[in-house]
Amino acid sequence: GHAAANCALARVATALTRRVPASRHGLAEGGTPPWTLLLAVAAVAVLGVVAISLLRRALRIRFRYSKSIQTLRV
């Protein structure tokens, strides 16, 4: 599942980076509709939740390995 999640994150990141210059242009002109901002905020929130969950999994795995290593050292 990690590979699929990373692939999805990469796709979303590329999509966001492609749309960022256009949105910046709109912000400079002052003509961005609020729903695009809402979509951007929602996308960031979803990415944040996914990133946090992946980080928690990685930390759990690391803690398991570190515990096993400590027991092996002792």
From Swiss-Prot:
It is a single-pass membrane protein. Coiled coil: none annotated. It is found in: Virion membrane. The chain crosses the membrane at residues 35-55. Residues 1-34 are virion surface. Residues 56-73 are intravirion. Keywords: Membrane, Transmembrane, Transmembrane helix, Viral envelope protein, Virion. Signal peptide: none annotated. GO terms for cellular component: membrane; viral envelope; virion membrane. Belongs to the chordopoxvirinae L1 protein family. This is Protein F9 homolog. It comes from Orf virus (strain NZ7). The lineage of its organism: Viruses, Varidnaviria, Bamfordvirae, Nucleocytoviricota, Pokkesviricetes.
